[in-house]
Amino acid sequence: MATDFSFFIYDYESFGINPASDRPAQFAGIRTDADFNIIGEPVMLYCKQTNDYLPAPEAVMVTGITPQECNEKGISEPEFSAKILAEFSQPNTCVMGYNNIRYDDEMTRYTFYRNFIDPYEYSWKNGNSRWDLLDVVRACYALRPEGINWAYDDDGMPSFRLEKLTKANGIEHENAHDAMADVYATIAMAKLIKIGRASCRERV
């Protein structure tokens, strides 16, 4: 592993569930070292909305973020994209989130493409990579569940929703649909898994 390796843990809130056609509302990210200790200043961005896009009302109700708030606090989508690219493109960065492979990374790619930025280069160039903590959580449940309090739905099936797991494990996560709150919760879950796996290795 490179001596300057870092994770950049991030999350979007958006105005819809389809990364191909919907737009980002809010971006948050934090850089950590390999042990998930915070080493950089938090990044919080809002994206101004264009007049040719209609947000999904359901998304506004879930996140509480309105187009008016984004237009008041935000920056244009080209500038929004450039600032995200600057964070993602630092050498030896592993870009990570919770369910990011299936959603947030796709939101990034479509946003970059729309703004004439290579949508893939950030994830491989200069020793960079991407990773999804959700898949690690699922693997822990299947292979080494000790050390984590697991959450279950009413039908008895395991739930891997971040807000349910943080509640089950006493992790602060007051606003589950704020991007920065989700980033801090993801970091806390990553630390919990790392500590749990280390204690398992010590017992072997």
Give the positions of each predicted feature.
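Metal-dependent phosphoesterase signature
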Residues: 63-80
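Residue-level detector of conserved catalytic or cofactor/ligand-binding positions
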Residues: 195-204
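Short acidic, Gly/Ser-rich segments with clustered Asp/Glu that frequently serve as metal-coordination loops
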Residues: 13-20
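Short hydrophobic beta-strand that contains or immediately precedes a catalytic carboxylate
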Residues: 9-11
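Acidic-residue sensor for enzyme active/binding pockets
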Residues: 13, 26, 202
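Short, basic/hydrophobic alpha-helical segments
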Residues: 77-90
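Metal-dependent phosphoesterase core characteristic of DEDDh/y 3'-5' exonuclease domains
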Residues: 5-6, 22-25, 31-33, 37-63, ...
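Phosphate/dinucleotide-binding and metal-coordinating scaffold of catalytic cores
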Residues: 2
